[in-house]
Design a protein with these regions (language model features):
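Residues immediately C-terminal
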Residues: 9, 42, 75
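Conserved ATPase-coupling elements of RecA-like P-loop NTPase cores
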Residues: 11-17, 44-47, 79-80
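Canonical P-loop GTPase G-domain recognition
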Residues: 55-65, 73-156
Length: 156
């Protein structure tokens, strides 16, 4: 497995032609995209929806398998993580949080982005992960194995 992290470079990598060129030329092996939802930022429904929207835009640019992670889960309360996981499982729960927690333009913008994401048909099932306690990485590895090796092991 080769994972390339582009911290702080999403605009450069995802929205310019060079990003797609790098992805295509990096290796002849199977490829995918890991999109990371920053757990501390995404406990707010506006930021969660904005990340869904960005992940959707990246997916339409690369057309590669895409995996979604919620990072820094060790820094979230159990209730905060449960709420984000509920949002990913049930769009109506996210809509209810938008209505309850957002007002004005932020509410309208979130509702419109949710509608667009729904029309695109993106599925969001983020894995909670933490580099501090290694939570979720075995699940990510399993998902990658299912996609790229039909459940077999990776080989060099």
């Amino acid at each position: 497995i080769c994972i390339v992290d582009t911290p702080g470079q999403m605009e450069l990598f995802a929205f310019r032609n060079i990003g797609a060129q790098i992805a295509q030329e990096l290796t002849d092996a199977e490829k995918g995209v890991i999109y990371i939802f920053d757990g501390l930022q995404c406990k707010d429904p506006l930021n969660y929806v904005m990340n869904m929207f960005l992940a959707s835009a990246i997916n339409t640019k690369f057309f590669l398998p895409q995996y979604h992670l919620i990072s820094k889960t060790d820094l979230l309360s159990e209730a905060e993580l449960e709420e984000m996981m509920r949002w990913s499982e049930d769009p109506y729960a996210l809509e209810e949080s938008i209505d309850a927690k957002l007002t004005g333009m932020n509410r309208s913008m979130s509702q419109e982005m949710m509608e667009i994401i729904g029309r695109i048909g993106m599925d969001f099932d983020p894995l909670p992960v933490s580099s501090a306690n290694n939570e979720g990485f075995a699940d990510l590895y399993s998902k990658l194995m299912l996609t790229f090796t039909d459940g077999g092991k990776f080989t060099p």
